[in-house]
Amino acid sequence: MRPGEGRAGEGLPDSDRQEGAPHPRETGVLFGQARAEAELLDSYRAGRLHHAWLLGGRQGTGKATLAWRFARFLLAHPDPGTPEVRAARDLSVPAGHPAASAVAAGAPGDVAVLRRAFNEKSGKFFSEIRVDEVRRASGLFQQASRAGGYRICILDSAEDLNRNSANALLKLVEEPPQRSLFLVVAHHPAQVLPTLRSRCRLLLLDPLSGGDAVAALTALGPPWAGVAPEALAEAAARAGGSVGGALHYLGGERLALDRDAARLLGRLPAVDWGELHRLADRVGADEDDFAVLTGAILDWLHARLGQGGGDPRRLAPLAEVWEKVRRSARETLALNLDKKTFLFSTFADLSQATRAL
C-alpha cells in the first residue's frame, strides 16, 4: 500500500463515508453535476488541466463522488490524446475496468487520500486532519506513477485541516510535482486558507434539484430504494437537495421530529414548555436527533434574519441567539452536556428575542 492510500483492507472505518451510503469511491453514478463534470473533462482533453481544483458546494451534492469519478477516469485513461478520451461524453468508467476495480477496493496505486484518521485508542476519528496525514500522503509524489499518468491526492474535506496541516498541503500545492493533481473538497470554499484557495481553480457544484436528489437516493440501493418516493422527496427538500442531508432526515423518526420542531418554532414568542419537554425526551442522548433539532432551529433563525429588512438594530437579538445556538450546540456535543438544558435555554432565548421584534 502506498502512502496516504485508503484503509479498505484494514477493517478501520472511513471518516469520509456517509452513514447509510456507499463510500464515494464505490459510487458509479453522479446526478445533477453534468456541467462540473464537463469542465474537468474538457480541461483534461485540452491538455490544460490545472494541478489543483477546489470542488466547492454544499455538503451532500456529489463533490467527493466527482473527485473519485475523475480520479477513476484518469487512472483508466492516463493519456488525454487517446480516441477513448476524445470520444468520452462524461467521466464514467465501466465497472469491470481494472481502474474501477482498484478504486472500489480502496487501493488505487496512484491515489492518496487525505481525511481525518481513526484513533484506535479512543475508538473515534480525530477531530482534524493532522500534519502527519499530509506528510504520509506526500510520499505518493516521491514515487513514479505506476500507470505513467497523474498522481492524485483527494482531500475530503478542507474544513478538517488545521493550520499546520493546511500549511503543509500548501507547500505541496505551491510547488507541485510533475503530473500531480490535487482535488480538494470544500463545503465552504470561502473558509479555506486564502493562500491555498488562491492556488486552486474553483469549481462550484450546483445544488441538486428535487428530482436529481431523489434519483441519487434511490440509486443508493437498499434500504433507500424501498422508501416511498414521497418520503424521499420530503427529506430531499428539507435538506435543500443534499443527498447526505436527506439520509440524515430519513433515519428513524427524524422527519417527524423536524416537523414537530418547526411547529414549536412557529408559535414563538409563545412556548409550549410541556411539548418542548416531550420533544427533548424524544431526542434523549441521540446525537443525530439532536443535530436535526438544532438544524431546525438554525434554519428558522436564518429565515427570520433574511426577513429582517436589513435593519441591524432589529436583527441584533436574533443574530445573538444564532451565534449562541451554534456555539452552545457544539459545546453540548463536545463536552457531553445535557441536551435538554440546551433546548430549554435556547427556546427561552428565542422567546425573548422574538418578543423584542
Where are these regions (language model features)?
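Flexible beta-alpha connector loops of hexameric P-loop NTPases
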Residues: K121-V131, A158, L202-L203
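Charged, glycine-rich active-site and insertion segments that engage polyanionic ligands
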Residues: R2-F73, H77-A102, Q178-L181, H187-A303, ...
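Conserved alpha-helical scaffold flanking the Walker A/P-loop in AAA+ ATPase domains
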Residues: E39-Y44, E128-I152, D160, N167-K171
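Conserved Walker B catalytic segment
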Residues: S157-R179, H188
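Conserved beta-strand scaffold positions in the cores of enzyme catalytic domains, especially
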Residues: V111-V113, L202
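A short hydrophobic beta-strand->loop->alpha-helix junction that borders the nucleotide-binding pocket
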Residues: G56-G57, V113-F118
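Loop/turn-to-beta-strand initiation segments
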Residues: A147-I152, P177-L183
